[in-house]
């Protein structure tokens, strides 16, 4: 009965989604207030029914209802409770339901936090989001029903993929989906602006906080996925340029460009058409990621094995949404004024250059991801594109972008002078150069890669400090400086914090890439190996077991200069149901380094192959991501998006001349 309730709730949600996508948009076109008023209750009702369906599926997993095919395929009676809950979104069908649930959460957010917006704007935005819901609910009900019955019921389930039986995977998909799907709000605002014929600063102000919050979630989701791969897969790597990793990274790159472009459109009225195009592309790449994961064209630890017909459905939906959006853009954008002009050297030109570099970087990642798939689909042959391609193409595009990141915030709008910029940033450049010389030498060996990476990171931090100092210059003493700092918008501090986060990330990537070391060694009880100034002693292996697995657990003691540092216990697990061997690494976490040990396989009566790693500054990679996310949250919480906008923006919108309805 519970699965049938969930199924019926999805049907009702689809009905409301149809009403949400048709009536409000038609009402906005006709000026019919009653039809426009349908948008909010339809979106809220849709959320209620999708949440009921999600709860029914979660209950089926928790209750071990193996008469549901989804549960029988992705769970087991021995699976711990928290992983049974996480198994709700561990399958293709369940994760698709999570996708729709997240979409309805964003829709409800629009209904709650956009009460100050004109009714026709909200109607169009929610109408577009309703259309997206119709597509995914239809896809789920007709090709990927999470409540399909299995009769007679299975005596037990096949178990959840052991790779997913990890706390990181409990939180990684929801965070990632909140980012993926969050770009649908910016997309919907852009389409609403195109439909209304009002591509002005107003729509940019309305959509900017939504875009920033979505970017924050996507940043956290990607970072958590990277950290999960680092400690769970046993390879010691934090990014593999896996096609599905790339599928989440591409919208992040374009979303980063969109966040900056929205700022220019809001503050200066420029980049109007460009910003709309970025909003379309960011969500298009989110849909592309959905296609890659669910179409069956990929082999990946992230991908779902699915029926190719599902891929055709998603591809058709992708073509309709993106093709329709681009056609509307081509029709409307030519009527939009370009905004005020600006010189070749100005903050606008620097931001535009950075946008182009980010878009080119996303394009290079897309080429490396899709080109092998296209060759395979055309029967030309199989080709593997690995890290050497991505690092060779991606890094040269990002280096100038990182340099411009230090110049842009201090440059003047409209027109800036190079001599003036050089004068204001001379100390930042000096600090960056000195730091780039000192840090590699302090690491014990000079590396050109390390020096270049530290130069860029130190440049970003020093120029951010110079930008803040320039802002308070001439404030008239300590009291004036404090007053100026208090009056500075949160969005400004959020920008600086996010930029510092990128610098910290670059430090982590540069130093771990330049100075990490690893060894694969055969170790028996009593054997030792030295790495990175640490001595690892293999004490032996004993058998242990968990709720649904058995494991061989090794013990290694780590010392430095005769002083005990850590005791590490890596495991080699065998999950009983699927007979899947898994490596559980043991890590001693430190602010400046990680000591990483993985137990590979037995190579004798008492001997094992052991992989040991010394990774300096690797934690700064994820620390930088956290700082980026905190900067985004700080920017999104700017009071300008809550106070004053309620009175100013609708009035400005209503006063806009020549708007098409």
Identify the function of each model-found stretch.
Residues 11-25, 32, 95-226, 234:
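A conserved hydrophobic secondary-structure block that centers on an alpha-helix together
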Residues 519-611:
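Soluble non-transmembrane domains of integral membrane proteins
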Residues 86-87, 161-166, 592-620, 624:
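Short, aromatic-rich amphipathic segments at membrane interfaces
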Residues 174, 181-191, 202-261, 274, ...:
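Extended, hydrophobic alpha-helical segments in both membrane/secreted and soluble proteins
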Residues 51-126, 141-162, 222-266, 289-312, ...:
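Membrane-interface helix-loop-helix modules in multi-pass inner-membrane proteins
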Residues 1-34, 52, 66, 243-253, ...:
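Contiguous transmembrane helix-bundle modules in multi-pass membrane proteins
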Residues 25-31, 108-117, 188-199, 259-266, ...:
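Structural signal for the C-terminal ends of transmembrane alpha-helices
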Residues 29-50, 112-133, 195-216, 241, ...:
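Membrane-interfacial loop-to-helix junctions in multi-pass inner-membrane proteins
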């Amino acid at each position: 009965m519970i699965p049938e309730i969930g199924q019926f709730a999805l049907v009702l949600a689809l009905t409301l989604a149809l009403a949400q996508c048709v009536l409000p948009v038609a009402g906005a076109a006709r000026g019919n207030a009653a039809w426009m008023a349908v948008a909010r209750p339809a979106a809220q009702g849709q959320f209620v029914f999708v949440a009921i369906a999600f709860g029914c599926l979660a209950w089926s997993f928790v209750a071990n209802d193996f008469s549901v095919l989804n549960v029988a395929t992705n769970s087991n009676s021995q699976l711990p409770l928290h992983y049974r809950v996480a198994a709700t979104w561990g399958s293709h069908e369940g994760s698709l339901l999570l996708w729709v649930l997240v979409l309805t959460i964003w829709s409800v957010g629009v209904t709650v936090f956009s009460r100050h917006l004109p009714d026709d704007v909200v109607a169009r935005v929610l109408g577009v989001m309703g259309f997206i819901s119709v597509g995914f609910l239809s896809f789920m009900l007709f090709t990927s029903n999470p409540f399909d019955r299995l009769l007679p019921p299975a005596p037990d389930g096949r178990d959840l993929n052991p790779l997913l039986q990890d706390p990181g995977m409990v939180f990684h998909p929801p965070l990632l989906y909140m980012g993926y799907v969050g770009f649908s709000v910016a997309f919907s605002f852009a389409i609403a602006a195109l439909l209304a014929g009002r591509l002005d600063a107003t729509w940019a102000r309305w959509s900017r906080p939504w875009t920033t919050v979505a970017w924050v979630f996507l940043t956290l989701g990607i970072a958590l996925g990277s950290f999960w791969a680092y400690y769970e897969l046993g390879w010691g790597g934090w990014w593999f340029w896996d096609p599905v990793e790339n599928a989440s990274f591409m919208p992040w790159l374009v979303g980063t460009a969109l966040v900056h472009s929205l700022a220019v459109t809001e503050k200066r009225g420029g980049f109007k058409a460009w910003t709309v195009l970025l909003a379309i592309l960011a969500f298009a790449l989110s849909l592309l990621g959905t296609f890659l994961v669910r179409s069956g064209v990929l082999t990946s630890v992230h991908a779902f094995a699915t029926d190719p017909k599902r891929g055709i459905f998603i591809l058709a939906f992708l073509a309709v949404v993106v093709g329709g959006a681009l056609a509307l853009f081509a029709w409307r954008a030519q009527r939009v004024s370009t905004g005020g002009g600006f010189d070749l050297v100005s903050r606008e030109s620097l931001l535009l250059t950075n946008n182009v570099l980010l878009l080119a970087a996303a394009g290079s990642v897309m080429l490396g991801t899709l080109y092998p798939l296209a060759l395979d689909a055309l029967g030309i042959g199989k080709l593997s594109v690995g890290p050497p391609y991505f690092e060779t193409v991606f890094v040269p595009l990002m280096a100038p972008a990182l340099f411009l990141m230090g110049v842009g915030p201090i440059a003047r709008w409209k027109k800036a002078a190079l001599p003036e910029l050089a004068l204001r940033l001379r100390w930042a450049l000096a600090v960056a150069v000195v730091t780039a010389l000192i840090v590699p030498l302090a690491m014990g060996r000079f590396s050109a890669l390390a020096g270049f990476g530290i130069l860029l990171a130190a440049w970003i931090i020093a120029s951010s400090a110079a930008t803040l100092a320039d802002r308070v210059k001439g404030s008239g003493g300590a009291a004036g400086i404090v007053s100026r700092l208090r009056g500075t918008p949160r969005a400004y501090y959020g920008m600086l914090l996010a930029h510092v986060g990128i610098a910290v990330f670059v430090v982590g990537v540069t130093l771990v890439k330049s100075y990490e070391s690893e060894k694969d060694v055969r170790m028996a009880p009593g054997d030792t190996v030295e790495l990175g100034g640490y001595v690892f002693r293999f004490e032996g292996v004993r058998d242990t077991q968990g709720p649904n697995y058995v494991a061989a657990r090794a013990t290694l003691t780590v010392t430095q200069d005769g002083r005990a540092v850590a005791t590490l216990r890596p495991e080699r697990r065998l999950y009983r149901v699927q007979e899947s061997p898994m490596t559980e690494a043991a890590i001693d976490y430190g602010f400046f380094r990680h000591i990483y040990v993985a137990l590979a396989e037995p190579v004798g009566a008492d001997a094992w192959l052991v992989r040991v790693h010394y990774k300096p500054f690797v934690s700064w990679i994820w620390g930088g991501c956290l700082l980026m996310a905190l900067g985004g949250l700080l920017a999104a919480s700017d009071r300008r998006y809550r106070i004053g906008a309620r009175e100013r923006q609708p009035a400005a919108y209503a006063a806009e001349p020549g708007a098409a309805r």
